[in-house]
């Protein structure tokens, strides 16, 4: 991928608009996880060093498009950015609600343009809206990896009309990390895919089966693979219609099959836990976590890995009685010398729970984008940035 980078440009005297991914969880006006803002800060700080006229925008939540709703305002993000930037990078951080007809800067301020989803036509990549975004700036910086797979006005459409578009530091890091894991991995390469359903991650599993030396499946997904081998799964969640798909994947890739599991007759954090061999599962029991023998086998594989990609928990880790598999695998990845990359909301919750964030090589900010990159899909915003790079070479 050839793109112009923010580090390539002299932004002196330029109006700069950064599309970040500041879509953070907010409860009662308070941000409950600042991970995405923290990841976006290096690009914002660099832009502020290079230009006196910097604007940042993002979506937040799922408001009704075209309607203002205070619940989805970027105001909590503004308050967080004030603490991070005032007196060191800027004098003020100001939220601008009405900006489509133009904005005015005061000296030493960073402008945060209100939630793009308050603008009619954002999600449909509306041409008129895209032109209005483009009129605001001389340089557009796309840094929202988490939205890079979407064809929307603030991530893609603006690029058709702005004179210059480049990638931010975060977008570049995301693409490089995923490329390192998927396009040219150090081997053995181990992929871990958890979650409840094969159907939601079918293309991901298919893509990873072609690049991974070992494909470890967990959660409800593993139950479908067990059923494909004729194993008992009791009343566990599995997808009978996808058994032929699971059989095909088992033939094409080394997928370690569980030998023992933790089961219960009820789905509860207070449910009694029984560890037993797969062959001993009763019809009224459901698989909720890995057994010790299965965990040991997976840890042996991870200990030899040079590249590890992880998406999705291995068991019902939200319940203390069924989190051992996810916990042990988390710590094994943290201790490994392999290049490790993780992505997906539940997976990030797990690494936060077990306090291993600082021991992971790269934590992706993308959920759907992370999965779509693994699937091999083309990102419209990346294609747009590549076109700008090509046009500037000619």
Curated annotation (Swiss-Prot):
Enumerate the Gene Ontology biological process terms: gluconeogenesis; glycolytic process
Task: Identify the metabolic or biological route this protein is part of.
Answer: Carbohydrate degradation; glycolysis; pyruvate from D-glyceraldehyde 3-phosphate: step 2/5
Binding sites annotated in the UniProt record for substrate = 21-23, 59-62, 117, 150
The record lists the catalysed reaction(s) as:
(2R)-3-phosphoglycerate + ATP = (2R)-3-phospho-glyceroyl phosphate + ADP
Can you tell me which residues bind ATP?
A: 201, 318, 344-347
Q: Which Gene3D superfamilies match?
A: Phosphoglycerate kinase, N-terminal domain (3.40.50.1260)
Cellular component GO terms held in the UniProt record: cytosol
A Pfam match? PGK
Cite the EC number: 2.7.2.3
Q: Which PROSITE patterns match?
A: PGLYCERATE_KINASE
Sorted keywords for this record are:
ATP-binding, Cytoplasm, Glycolysis, Kinase, Nucleotide-binding, Transferase
Subcellular location, record wording:
Cytoplasm
- The top EC class is transferase
Q: Name one GO molecular function term.
A: ATP binding
- Highest taxon of source: Bacteria
Give the family from UniProt: Belongs to the phosphoglycerate kinase family.
* Oligomer status and interactors: Monomer.
What is the name of the protein in this document? Phosphoglycerate kinase
What gene name is given for the protein in this entry?
pgk
């Amino acid at each position: 991928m050839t793109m112009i980078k923010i580090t390539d440009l002299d932004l002196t005297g330029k109006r700069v608009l950064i599309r970040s991914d500041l879509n953070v969880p907010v409860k009662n006006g308070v941000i409950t996880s600042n991970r995405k803002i923290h990841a976006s800060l290096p690009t914002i700080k660099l832009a502020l060093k290079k230009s006196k006229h910097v604007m940042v925008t993002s979506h937040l939540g799922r408001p009704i498009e075209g309607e203002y709703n205070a619940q989805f305002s970027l105001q909590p993000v503004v308050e967080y950015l004030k603490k991070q930037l005032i007196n060191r990078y800027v004098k003020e951080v100001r939220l601008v609600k009405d900006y489509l007809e133009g904005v005015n800067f005061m000296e030493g301020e960073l402008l945060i343009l209100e939630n793009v989803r308050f603008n009619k036509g954002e999600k449909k990549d509306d041409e008129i809206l895209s032109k209005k975004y483009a009129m605001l700036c001389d340089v557009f910086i796309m840094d929202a990896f988490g939205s890079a797979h979407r064809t929307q006005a603030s991530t893609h459409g603006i690029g058709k009309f702005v004179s210059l578009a480049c990638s931010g530091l975060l977008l570049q890091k995301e693409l490089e990390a995923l490329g390192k894991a998927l396009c040219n991995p150090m081997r053995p390469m181990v992929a871990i895919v958890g979650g409840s359903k094969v159907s939601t991650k079918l293309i991901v599993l298919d893509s990873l089966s072609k690049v991974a030396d070992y494909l470890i499946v967990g959660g409800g997904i593993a139950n479908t693979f067990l059923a494909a081998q004729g194993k008992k799964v009791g009343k566990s969640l599995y997808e009978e219609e996808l058994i032929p798909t699971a059989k095909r994947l088992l033939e094409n890739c080394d997928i370690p099959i569980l030998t023992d599991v933790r089961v219960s007759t009820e789905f509860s954090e207070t449910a009694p836990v029984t560890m037993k061999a797969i062959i001993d599962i009763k019809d009224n029991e459901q698989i909720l976590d890995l057994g010790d023998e299965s965990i040991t086998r997976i840890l042996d594989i991870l200990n030899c890995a040079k590249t590890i990609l992880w998406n999705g928990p291995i068991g019902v880790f939200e319940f203390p009685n069924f989190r051992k598999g996810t916990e042990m695998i988390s710590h094994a990845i943290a201790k490994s010398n392999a290049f490790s990359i993780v992505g997906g909301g539940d997976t990030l919750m797990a690494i936060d729970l077990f306090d291993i964030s600082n021991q992971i090589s790269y934590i992706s900010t993308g959920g759907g984008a992370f999965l779509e990159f693994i699937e091999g899909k083309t990102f419209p915003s990346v294609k747009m940035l590549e076109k700008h790079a090509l046009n500037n070479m000619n």
